[in-house]
Every structure is written in structure tokens, then in C-alpha cells.
């Protein structure tokens, strides 16, 4: 069924980008599949130029690979990718927390605590989307204060690659419960003024692939691409 042409205050390229990302998030464009530019252009009612520009952005972010004269492939998220992303996010968030530490006052800490309480409520109500949103907002408090927009952009893009590609439909409750404990421990370190310890905890526990591996395997167990590119 043909989709109505996109009408929005955003540029056509931005609209097409948002559409493609939403298709990936919902699992309509699965890892390993291909994108037909001709068909997609007709479906959206746009020319190939904004579509090409959107695909170039997606390629820079690691979501697709453009093969000249061969087509566009939606990238597979392999176990090695996940390991690499955890290393990168851990290092960057650790740096961000150190840079922002002196700006984390009572209002910011209360905001972070509020997100933790929201995560607990989300687990009780089996609302994964709410849990995910509160989790992101917790980290966004110190990311937003670190003063490095490039760092923040990279972290957010990698999180989308990890958890929005496509969005999993259920909890790994043991992981979410453990994660809440980690957020509470991080808040405790921040409250005690232990900047170095808090930064190390982010890097070496919260974003440690080795620490989180058993949960990661459960989270991606329904993703064939994960197992086909399994532990190396």
C-alpha cells in the first residue's frame, strides 16, 4: 500500500531518515535485509536525493552499508559489534561523568533518583518502553552537563544501535533488576563525592561486556543474527 507523501516542517532528508529509523526500530527493516531505493522512493513519494542523503547518514551511524552499483544492506549487529560498543560507551560515559561531576547538585541527583524510581515502576507494570526511556533519561543528566556535544551524539547513536535495532519486545527482568541496583550504586558514589570511583563503576561494571554478557545473550536470544555471528 502506497504511503502518503511526507509533509512536515523538517527537511525531506530528515523525514526520510526518521521513517527509515522507525522501520528499523519496529523490525520492518531487519538486519541483513536490503533497501530498494526505487521502491522506497516511490513508497514515500519523494525523489531519490533526500533518500540518498538519509541513507548516507545511516551509513555514517553504522545502520546500513551502501554498496556502489549493488544496493544498500541493513547491517547485522554482531556479538563483536556489541563488545566494541560497550567498550566505547563505557569509556565515553566515564569521561562525561568526570567532566560533569562538579555540576551534579541536589536538583540533578533528585532527577536521577526520580528516573530510578520510574524504572522500578516500569518493571512492576511490565512496561519496557517506559523502563528504557527512564534509563536513558538517567544517563542524560550527566551527559547533558559534560559540555561535549560530539561525545553525547556518539553515545546516543551507539545506544540506538544496541537497543533500537529492532527494539526488543520484552524484559530480561534479572538484567533490569541488576541494572537498577547499578544505578543506585552509582548514585551512592555520586552522593559521596567519589568522582573517580563513580566513573570507574560506569566503565568497569555498568558498561562492562564481561559483567553484562550473560544478560546480553538473553536479551538478543531471539535475534538470529546475534547467534549466527556468535561469540568469538
Question: What kind of region is each of these model predictions?
Answer:
Residues 72, 80, 98, 117, ...:
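Positions in alpha-helical segments
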Amino acid at each position: 500500500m502506497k504511503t502518503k507523501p511526507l509533509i512536515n516542517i523538517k527537511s525531506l532528508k530528515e523525514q526520510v531518515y526518521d521513517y527509515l529509523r522507525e522501520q528499523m526500530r519496529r523490525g520492518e527493516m531487519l538486519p541483513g535485509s536490503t533497501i530498494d531505493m526505487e521502491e522506497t522512493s516511490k513508497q514515500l513519494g519523494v525523489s531519490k536525493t533526500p533518500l540518498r542523503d538519509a541513507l548516507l547518514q545511516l551509513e555514517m551511524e553504522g545502520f546500513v552499508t551502501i554498496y556502489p552499483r549493488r544496493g544498500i544492506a541493513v547491517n547485522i549487529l554482531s556479538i563483536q559489534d556489541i563488545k566494541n560498543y560497550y567498550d566505547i560507551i563505557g569509556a565515553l560515559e566515564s569521561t562525561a561523568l568526570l567532566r560533569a561531576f562538579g555540576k551534579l547538585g541536589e536538583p540533578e541527583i533528585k532527577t536521577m533518583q526520580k528516573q530510578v524510581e520510574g524504572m522500578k515502576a516500569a518493571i512492576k507494570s511490565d512496561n519496557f518502553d517506559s523502563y528504557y526511556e527512564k534509563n536513558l533519561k538517567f544517563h542524560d543528566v550527566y551527559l547533558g552537563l559534560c559540555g561535549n556535544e560530539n561525545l553525547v551524539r556518539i553515545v546516543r547513536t551507539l545506544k540506538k544501535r544496541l537497543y533500537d535495532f529492532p527494539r526488543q519486545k520484552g524484559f530480561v527482568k534479572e538484567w533490569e533488576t541488576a541494572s537498577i541496583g547499578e544505578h543506585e550504586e552509582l548514585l551512592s558514589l555520586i552522593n559521596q563525592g567519589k568522582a573517580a570511583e563513580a566513573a570507574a563503576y560506569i566503565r568497569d561494571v555498568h558498561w562492562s561486556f564481561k559483567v553484562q554478557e550473560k544478560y546480553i545473550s538473553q536479551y538478543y536470544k531471539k535475534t538470529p543474527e546475534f547467534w549466527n555471528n556468535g561469540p568469538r
